[in-house]
Amino acid sequence: MNNSKNFNLFLMDGEVTGRIKCTLSNWTGIAYKIPRTYLDKCKDRLDLKQSGVYFLFGKNDDGDDEVYIGQAGIRKNGEGVLFRVSEHLKDEIYFSDAVMLTTQKTHLGQQKFLI
């Protein structure tokens, strides 16, 4: 298996319904799955102050699944992807979970796209 990969899933709250951090060996990227109600517990995570892309998962008025996809850069106030996702708490768009893709270090800088 020359193309095999090893994912590391860290249950940040010790439960699968809580926050999950996902890393992949030999990749500088990092993914977080964070329930809406846990967003405020992530304010001290420096990697979530980086630029990144995010997915907001929820249901529409008909009960159908939907996803909103967005991107965030590093702002002048030093905030990044988590701050942008938190801004959606004021929107009419309801979401139950957020998935954020960013970097473990400042490898992304102000880039517009993740590859």
Residue ranges and their predicted role:
Residues 73-115:
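Conserved short loop/helix modules at catalytic or binding sites
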Residues 1-80:
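GIY-YIG nuclease catalytic motif and its immediate N-terminal context
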